[in-house]
């Protein structure tokens, strides 16, 4: 096991435009970190730099306090699991897991001990003589993990390892990854575009956007207190409702573009006349039966459509020409065209500066 440190890591392919911008990260011994973000955000590039498959333009990478920035991948003490398994089709499961050890000069008995132990951990013992074509997708991915485990690396690197699996198998493999990490306690850096994977696997999440680490925090911190508008819009399904507007001169209302006002039970006079974006998650909006427009009874919204999800329902509408989604219980089934009265609890409101995108603190 080892710690991992990234110090002002930057990457540019043309020497002008950075695709990774000054990333600083400290991963403690045995920690499981997940990088999440949309396609093209730089998460896989950053992982490849840690692996040594990409060179940094500037900055340094340390593994267990050893500077590895210019080291070859084989000398860094890392093991990588890829999206496409990368198994040798003509080799058995045993030989696939053992191959890396063979070319590094390990003895037969040491190889057998390591492969047998990894197979036991991953429940692959009955499959050691099979070829990859005889395995399911989940079994192939476990073989790929086994090949990484036998190396006994200082750091595990995972590059979207579950992307090729169907939804049901992804759930199963997430659970297996959690159990594997609890057992091995190896420092791990994991890349995914799937926020469910990020939130369920990570001890800390790095939300990436355009080469920048927008926020680094626990899953709870990232979800409950997003640091930027991007994080608020990316994390959560459905995403946080984000409404652009201005705080009234007395700080007691939030005025939307068309003049519609949302009462603020907790006045914000310090932000008077300032252009902000108000955010609230769909599950925090509460439906009221009263038709009064006071904040305690709810603000009216005409229902455009209702999505029935089984466990709950999503009500879609608009305020001030801006989309709003409220998560209702499965028992609440209003019809399209009806008016809902929605209450916004003060403690559930988030405010962001509309220009910088940064979170506003009261």
From Swiss-Prot:
GO terms for biological process: carbohydrate transport; glycerophosphodiester transmembrane transport. The keyword Transmembrane helix does not apply. It is found in: Cell inner membrane. SUPFAM superfamilies: MOP-like, P-loop containing nucleoside triphosphate hydrolases. ATP binds at residues 37-44. It comes from the Bacteria. It is a peripheral membrane protein. Pfam families: ABC_tran (PF00005), OB_MalK (PF17912). GO terms for molecular function: ABC-type glycerol-3-phosphate transporter activity; ATP binding; ATP hydrolysis activity. Residues 4-235 form the ABC transporter domain. PROSITE patterns: ABC_TRANSPORTER_1 (PS00211), ABC_TRANSPORTER_2 (PS50893), UGPC (PS51315). The keyword Cell division does not apply. Keywords: ATP-binding, Cell inner membrane, Cell membrane, Membrane, Nucleotide-binding, Sugar transport, Translocase, Transport. Its EC number is 7.6.2.10. It catalyses: sn-glycerol 3-phosphate(out) + ATP + H2O = sn-glycerol 3-phosphate(in) + ADP + phosphate + H(+). One of its GO terms (cellular component) is ATP-binding cassette (ABC) transporter complex, substrate-binding subunit-containing. Part of the ABC transporter complex UgpBAEC involved in sn-glycerol-3-phosphate (G3P) import. Responsible for energy coupling to the transport system. Belongs to the ABC transporter superfamily. sn-glycerol-3-phosphate importer (TC 3.A.1.1.3) family. The complex is composed of two ATP-binding proteins (UgpC), two transmembrane proteins (UgpA and UgpE) and a solute-binding protein (UgpB). This is sn-glycerol-3-phosphate import ATP-binding protein UgpC. It comes from Yersinia enterocolitica serotype O:8 / biotype 1B (strain NCTC 13174 / 8081).
